[in-house]
Design a protein with these regions (language model features):
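A non-catalytic alpha/beta surface segment that caps or lines the substrate-entry region
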Residues: 22-70, 74-76, 80, 91
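Short, conserved micro-motifs enriched in small and acidic residues
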Residues: 28, 135-146, 228-236, 383-390
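Active-site metal-coordination/substrate-binding segment of hydrolases
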Residues: 67-161, 169
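Phosphate-handling active-site elements
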Residues: 153-166, 247-254, 405
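N-terminal capping segment at the start of a domain
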Residues: 2-28, 129-130, 318, 378-379
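Metal-dependent amide/peptide-bond hydrolase catalytic core
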Residues: 235-405
Length: 405
C-alpha cells in the first residue's frame, strides 16, 4: 500500500487534542486511531504492538540476522491534530496533475493560491491532496504515521539489513504533552527520528526554547463619573503592558532564527484582565532576556499603578534540543546523506516551534525531526503531495540502511 492511501484512511479518523480537559490523553477520540494502528502493526508483523492507558502505541521490529546486537533506532509520529478547523470530519480531496495555479477548495470559498504559498508552483505536475477547505487535512502528523507504516511494509521484503527498530505513535503533541507519559524504557531505542516536519528532505535539530507567560491585571472599578485619580482600568493597563513589548517581535514579523512574543489570548474588563503569551527564541541567552523584559515591565507598571496591580507567571515549556543533538551529529549526517542518495537536496532548517523529539531528547532519547512532504499545517490550506510522501518514505528507508551500514 502507498503512503498516501494510508493517509487518506487516517485523516478520516477524528483526533483533535484539547487543552481544556486536563486528562491524558486529552481526548478519547485518539484511541480510535490508536486501536486501528495497533491492528495494522500486528498485520505487518510488528512485535508487541499495543496501546497503553494513556494512548501511546508501541511496537518493535526484530533485527535481521547478524544485526541483533546493534544499536536500536526508533521512528515516532503523533496521532492528534489541532482542534482549530476541526469541528467535523475531514473530507480529503485529490487533485491529479496539479497545474501549480489557484485551486478552489471544494465549495468552501477558500482558494489555495501560489500568491499565498509561493512553493505551490514547484508542485506542478504532482498529485496534490487537500481538504475540502472546511477543515484541516490532518497531514500533521498523520502523514508521518502513514510513512512509517509504509516503511515497515517495505522492510518486510528483507532487502535492507537492520538492527532492532522501535516504533511509537503518541497522543497530544499539538498541546505540548506528547512526551508526558512516553515510556522511554518500553520504547527501547538508543536514537530516534520524529516524522513531523514539512517538505520532503527537511532535517531539523534546532527548535525554540519555549515558555508560556500569563499576565494578570487587578483593577479598581468605581463609578466613571467620580473616578478621577481612583479608577485603575485593568484592561487599559493590559494594553499598556503589551505596548511596552517590542512591536516587531511577533510571529508575523519574524522568521528563521528570530524569536518573538506571541499574544494569543486577551480577556478582561475594568476590574480584571488577563493576557496570555508564548515566548520563543532559539538562542538561550536571548530567551532569558525576553523573560526578564517581561519581569521588568511588570515591575515598572506596579510602581506606576500600585503594588499587586500586575502579576506575571512564566512557565517553562521546552528547550532547544540542539545541545543534545550536537553530541550525536551522526544522526544528522545519516539523514543528510540519505537525502542526497535519494536525489533530494537536504534542507536543514530551524524548527519554529517544538516537536515531541525536543522533549524526548532531554529525556535521554536524541530525536531530530524529518519532513513528511506537507505544507501549511494547522489550517484549511494544509496540503501534501503523493510524490512528496513517497520521497519521505524513501529517505526514511535510506536512513535505516546507512545507520546500520
Amino acid at each position: 500500500m502507498k503512503a498516501y492511501e494510508r493517509l487518506l484512511s487516517y485523516v478520516k479518523v477524528f483526533t483533535p487534542s484539547s487543552e481544556e480537559t486536563g486528562t491524558s490523553p486529552s481526548t478519547q477520540y485518539q484511541f480510535d486511531l490508536a486501536r486501528l494502528l495497533v491492528q495494522e502493526l500486528k498485520e505487518l508483523g510488528v512485535k508487541g504492538a499495543d496501546v497503553d492507558e494513556h494512548c501511546y502505541v508501541y511496537g518493535h521490529i526484530p533485527a535481521t540476522r547478524g544485526y541483533e546486537s546493534r544499536q536500536k533506532l526508533g521512528f515516532i509520529a503523533h496521532m492528534d491534530t489541532v482542534s482549530d478547523f476541526c469541528d467535523h470530519p475531514v473530507t480529503p480531496v485529490i487533485t491529479p496533475n496539479y497545474d501549480g495555479k489557484d485551486l478552489a477548495l471544494g465549495t468552501s470559498g477558500r482558494v489555495l493560491s501560489p500568491k499565498m504559498f509561493p512553493h505551490l508552483s514547484t508542485l506542478k505536475g504532482r498529485t496534490l491532496i487537500t481538504s475540502d477547505g472546511t477543515t484541516i487535512l490532518g497531514a500533521d502528523d498523520k502523514a508521518g504515521i502513514a510513512e512509517i507504516m509504509t516503511m515497515i511494509e517495505s522492510l518486510n521484503d528483507n532487502t535492507i539489513p537492520h538492527g532492532p527498530l522501535c516504533i511509537a505513535f503518541t497522543p497530544d503533541e499539538e498541546i505540548g504533552m506528547g512526551p508526558a507519559h512516553f515510556d522511554i524504557k518500553k520504547f527501547g531505542a538508543d536514537f530516534a527520528y520524529t516524522l513531523d516536519g514539512d517538505t520532503e528532505g527537511e532535517i531539523q535539530y534546532e527548535n525554540f526554547n519555549a515558555a508560556k507567560a500569563v499576565v494578570e491585571f487587578a483593577g479598581v472599578n468605581v463609578h466613571p463619573g467620580s473616578s478621577k485619580n481612583t479608577m485603575v482600568n485593568a484592561a487599559l493597563v493590559a494594553m499598556e503592558f503589551n505596548s511596552m513589548l517590542p512591536s516587531a517581535d511577533t510571529p508575523r514579523d519574524t522568521e528563521d532564527y528570530e524569536g518573538f512574543f506571541h499574544l494569543y489570548s486577551i480577556k478582561g474588563d475594568v476590574s480584571h484582565a488577563t493576557l496570555e503569551y508564548i515566548i520563543r527564541d532559539h538562542d538561550a541567552a536571548s530567551f532569558d532576556v525576553r523573560k526578564k523584559s517581561m519581569e521588568h515591565i511588570t515591575k515598572i507598571l506596579n510602581e506606576k499603578w500600585g503594588k499587586g496591580t500586575v502579576s506575571l507567571t512564566i512557565t517553562e515549556q521546552y528547550r532547544n534540543m540542539k545541545e543534545i543533538i550536537d553530541t550525536c551529529m551522526e544522526l544528522i549526517e545519516h539523514a543528510t546523506a540519505a537525502c542526497k542518495e535519494c536525489n533530494i537536496s537536504p534542507l536543514i532548517t530551524p524548527i519554529r516551534g517544538g516537536t515531541d523529539g525536543a522533549q524526548l531528547s532531554f529525556m535521554g532519547l536524541p530525536c531530530p525531526n524529518l519532513g513528511t512532504g506537507g505544507h501549511a499545517y494547522h489550517g484549511p490550506y494544509e496540503h501534501i503531495t503523493v510524490e512528496g510522501m513517497d520521497i519521505a518514505v524513501e529517505v526514511g528507508l535510506k536512513i535505516i540502511e546507512l545507520f546500520y551500514k
